[in-house]
A protein has these predicted regions:
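Glycan-recognition and catalytic cores of secretory/periplasmic carbohydrate-active enzymes
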Residues: 1-365
């Protein structure tokens, strides 16, 4: 695979999108055109991924157009910090890719303040009875989800920034609970665990965005591959690396049966065939993270599998037409919902994976 050649194609398309999108915040490209999530819900969980793409591009090209566009979205997010009741467990996705990325790359003190504000909101969702960060809002006080493993790096950053161990302690406890209750013995994972919010007793494991209870939603699996690996990066806790490896072995075994592109759910009926390329792209990044962490003699499995996934995505599922929004095609939001569409987070992880191979990535997590 020629990662440099793929990146050059990405650079051309992302530059065209940056000029075309202006101040819009993209999510799903329908008929080749991104809608603007500012008009739908500014606090929507995916709204940080386009700025994440922009900061990655700015870091590796130096083009100030990317920086300017990313800064605008970050400033827009001040509105959701002011009305924080609408925020949720995905503040990591929102602010790691905006304010924290800005601060890390430019030293902007206002960005630091925004990131710390978001980290305190995330920490405030922790339930000590069950040792988990509460997912969503409304009546879901006892819910935790695997996605949150990708948000807790915001807490690790805040803890280091403030030299305050409380943030890491919350992140560790949540991750410990995920190892215990979200990961299954075979390395697959539950999307959701529901606890009694007063006692912490586990109650049920609903289907979530997969096919059914007990099935295997591939993007949730990808969150676990990368999320546990990031837990190891930030803490050095071997248990997290072992959990990441178990999740990775399960993911690799499944995509090896389908040309190294992930089905939407690994335990769904054979028909209809539903893909989720965003899961594959995210998992590839997680596999590359694991490859950096393991001994040299273990590295090949994770590195090679990641490269085969990224190569398969480029060969089978990419649109390079600069007049159409979205690079990675055939992403799926959930089983039976918005299937086979370009998703902004799919493009983010695809870009991150390619940049990782080239040694040009900016560690946003």
């Amino acid at each position: 695979m020629d990662a440099e050649k793929i990146f050059k194609k990405m650079e051309v398309k992302i530059h065209a999108e940056c000029l075309r999108l202006g101040e819009r915040i993209p999510y799903i490209a329908e008929n080749g055109t991104y809608s603007d999530m500012r008009d739908v819900k500014l606090s929507w969980w995916t709204n940080g991924f386009w700025p994440g793409i922009l900061w990655q591009m700015y870091q590796c090209t130096g083009d100030s157009a990317y920086k300017t566009a990313a800064e605008h979205t970050e400033q827009e997010f001040d509105k959701i910090l002011e009305h924080f009741e609408a925020l949720h467990h995905d503040v990591g996705f929102l602010f790691l890719h905006t304010a924290v990325a800005d601060y890390r790359l430019t030293g902007n003190p206002k960005s630091r303040t925004r990131g710390l504000h978001a980290a305190n909101i995330l920490a405030g969702r922790f339930n000590p009875a069950g040792n988990y960060i509460r997912a969503w809002n409304e009546d879901k006080t006892g819910w935790m989800i695997v996605d949150c493993l990708m948000n807790v790096p915001l807490l690790y950053w805040a803890g280091r920034e403030l030299k305050d161990p409380r943030f890491e302690e919350i992140a560790r406890r949540h991750t410990d609970t995920a190892v215990k209750y979200l990961q299954r013995p075979d390395g697959s994972c539950n999307h959701i665990a529901v606890f009694d919010p007063l006692t912490g007793e586990p109650l049920e494991f609903p289907a979530g965005q997969g096919y059914a209870e007990g099935s295997s939603w591939s993007r949730g699996q990808a969150w676990s591959v990368y999320g546990f690996a990031l837990g190891y990066r930030h803490t050095g806790t071997k248990e997290y690396l072992e959990a990441a490896k178990r999740a990775a072995h399960y993911f690799i075994a499944n995509v090896a049966c389908t040309g190294f592109v992930s089905l939407l759910d690994f335990r769904a009926p054979e028909e209809p065939v539903c893909w989720d390329t965003s899961a594959a792209a995210c998992a590839a990044c997680g596999l590359l993270e694991i490859a950096q962490a393991v001994d040299e003699n273990e590295k090949f499995l994770y590195q090679n599998s990641a490269e085969r996934i990224l190569e398969a995505l480029e060969e089978k599922h990419c649109c390079w037409d600069t007049e159409k929004d979205g690079i990675l095609q055939d992403g799926s939001v959930a089983y039976g919902k918005q299937v086979h569409v370009p998703l902004i987070y799919g493009d983010y992880f695809f870009l991150e994976g390619i940049l990782r191979l080239l040694g040009k990535d900016f560690m946003i997590w």
